[in-house]
Curated annotation (Swiss-Prot):
SUPFAM superfamilies: Adenine nucleotide alpha hydrolases-like. This is Phosphoadenosine 5'-phosphosulfate reductase. HAMAP family: CysH. Catalyzes the formation of sulfite from phosphoadenosine 5'-phosphosulfate (PAPS) using thioredoxin as an electron donor. Belongs to the PAPS reductase family. CysH subfamily. It is an enzyme of class 1 (oxidoreductase). InterPro entries: PAPS/APS_Rdtase, PAPS_reduct_dom, PAPS_reductase_CysH, Rossmann-like_a/b/a_fold. It is found in: Cytoplasm. The active site is at residue 239. The lineage of its organism: Bacteria, Pseudomonadati, Pseudomonadota, Gammaproteobacteria, Enterobacterales. Transmembrane segments: none annotated.
Length: 244
């Protein structure tokens, strides 16, 4: 594997980009998560950033990447509708791991959005997608631009949903390299990592939540439900950040 040229790859059609990265991905699949991070820092261009929703297993990728690249900017897109426990979890992890947290929000406040558009999350798939565009996608795009990001780490795993089962370790999204170091981890591996390093799940995990986002589009897991059905009323899994 060798240093990759982001500009040259961005000039290719999407299908050709995937093919161009296929050999590299085949090699990355053989590496453990820490080696994937180290390889990326050596072979992919900076600036480097890590995104986190501070969800159920967030401590894993935050600890994993931050211990190899201390002070890496950690991007949080705050919708204003996170659970109180999530905000407390953010504070606790930021303090424990000494995170370089960068919080981005929509240009319109939550109250202003409701006045203008109503409760978008109650307006079907189109409403949810508009809500996500305003509160997740635009702030993330702004963060990547502000921080001059060229390589973006994220903690997605294939096991989490059907929409993630075929994701590679390395891809290009929003014009930057995107690296998923723990993409092939299962729930047991996550648990073992947390135990080994004295880290905790999100507080709501103990109350039956498998995935945590906004208060109005997250529900507890119940027997017979897939994890992805606990978000966005089962209408969709992704918030928009990891699509496209």
């Amino acid at each position: 594997m060798s240093v990759l040229d982001l500009n040259a790859l961005n000039d290719l059609p999407k299908v050709d980009r995937v093919l161009a990265l296929a050999e590299t991905n085949a090699e990355l699949e053989k590496l453990v998560a820490e080696e994937r991070v180290a390889w990326s820092l050596e072979n992919l261009p900076g600036e480097y950033v890590l995104s986190s929703s501070f969800g159920i297993q967030a401590a894993v990728s935050l600890h994993l990447v931050n211990q190899i690249r201390p002070d890496i900017p950690v991007i949080l897109t705050d919708t204003g509708y996170l659970f109180p426990e999530t905000y407390q979890f953010i504070d606790a992890l930021t303090d424990k791991l000494k995170l370089n947290l960068k919080v981005y929000r929509a240009t319109e406040s939550a109250a202003w959005q409701e006045a203008r558009y109503g409760k978008l999350w109650e307006q079907g798939v189109e409403g949810i997608e508009k809500y996500n565009e305003i509160n997740k996608v635009e702030p993330m795009n702004r963060a990547l631009q502000d921080l001059n990001a060229q390589t973006w780490f994220a903690g997605l795993r294939r096991e989490q949903s059907g929409s993630r089962t075929s994701l590679p370790v390395l891809a290009i999204q929003r014009g930057v390299f995107k690296v998923l170091p723990i993409i092939d981890w299962d729930n047991r591996t996550v648990y073992q990592y947390l135990q080994k390093h004295g880290l905790k799940y999100h507080p709501l995990w103990h109350q039956g939540y498998l995935s945590v986002g906004d208060t109005h589009t997250t529900r507890k897991w119940e027997p017979g439900m897939a994890e992805e059905e606990t978000r966005f009323f089962g209408l969709k899994r992704e918030c928009g950040l990891h699509e496209g």
